[in-house]
A protein has these predicted regions:
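Sec-dependent N-terminal signal peptides
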Residues: 1-27
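Alpha-solenoid helical repeat scaffolds
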Residues: 84, 101-104, 139, 173, ...
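Register position in tetratricopeptide repeats
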Residues: 127, 161, 195-196, 228-232
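Residue-level signature of tetratricopeptide-repeat
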Residues: 155-159, 189, 223
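Alpha-helical adaptor scaffolds
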Residues: 112-184
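Residue-level signature for tetratricopeptide repeat
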Residues: 86-89, 124, 158, 192, ...
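Compositionally biased, proline/threonine/alanine/serine-rich low-complexity intrinsically disordered stretches
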Residues: 21-111, 128, 231-235
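Terminal, low-structured helical/coil segments at or just beyond the last alpha-helical repeat
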Residues: 71-74, 98, 203-204, 208-235
Length: 235
């Protein structure tokens, strides 16, 4: 049995809805229920998905495919080319020293963690004058990274330090095949040739290095000294 209270409540609800809601505008959606007057729906209640009222309007403008992309990182070879070009054009001794330092740091990078670790150990052994240990490490290094000019240059240096001029020159030749601009290798070649009495050839090696680093004082001094010596021999 329906209670009287329920009937009264329904009647009051219907009356309230009818009093508060005006007749729906023509063409405007409305909520309709049996026994109740049509209730107009608010404008955003139809044709709108939940949460879409806060969504940013979608731009009809197509994305610009010509937007500039960030430049790709420069390769090691590109960085070296730039440093050597700046070195050749340098007019200042301090700038030259800084550029040579930057070149040396780049040339010490193998591109692999294992190679860099072996090189660090070899350099430490050289500093401690443990030349046998340094040679063993560098032998391994040139086997692992035969394309790495600095590995050959470091072994050339150790061989020079233990008076193995022939072995040092062989390694220097390999360095210059991989990196013809290697200043240390060219200077080392000049030192060995001069020590062996080949002053003309030593002078040419120093001059070649000086073309790469025109403001390096040690090379200037070597060229000046040997030029005088060679000219004196020709008199």
């Amino acid at each position: 049995m329906i209670r009287l209270g329920s009937i009264v409540a329904v009647a009051l609800l219907a009356a309230a809805l009818g009093a508060s809601a005006a007749a729906p505008e023509e063409g405007r959606p409305a909520l309709r229920a049996p026994g109740l007057s049509p209730v107009p729906l608010p404008p955003r209640a139809h044709g709108v998905s939940p949460g879409s009222e806060n969504a940013a309007p979608r731009s009809s403008k197509p994305e610009d495919s010509t937007q500039e992309k960030p430049p790709a990182p420069r390769t090691r070879a590109e960085l070296l080319n730039d440093l050597y070009a700046r070195l050749a054009a340098s007019k200042d001794a301090d700038e030259t020293a800084g550029l040579i330092g930057a070149i040396d740091r780049l040339e010490l990078e193998s591109g692999s963690d294992a190679g860099d670790l072996l090189m660090a150990r070899a350099v430490a052994a050289m500093a401690a004058k443990n030349y046998d240990v340094a040679l063993a490490l560098l032998d391994k290094l040139v086997d692992l990274h035969p394309e790495w000019a600095e590995a050959w240059n470091k072994r050339a240096t150790v061989r020079f330090l233990v008076d193995d001029d022939r072995g040092s020159m062989a390694d220097i030749a390999h360095v210059l095949k991989l990196e013809p601009r290697h200043i240390g290798a060219l200077a080392g070649m000049g030192v060995i040739l001069e020590r062996e009495g080949f002053r003309d050839d030593a002078l040419r090696a120093y001059q070649r290095a000086l073309q790469i680093a025109p403001q390096l004082k040690s090379l200037k001094d070597s060229v000046e000294r040997l030029t005088k010596a060679v000219q004196g021999e020709d008199l």
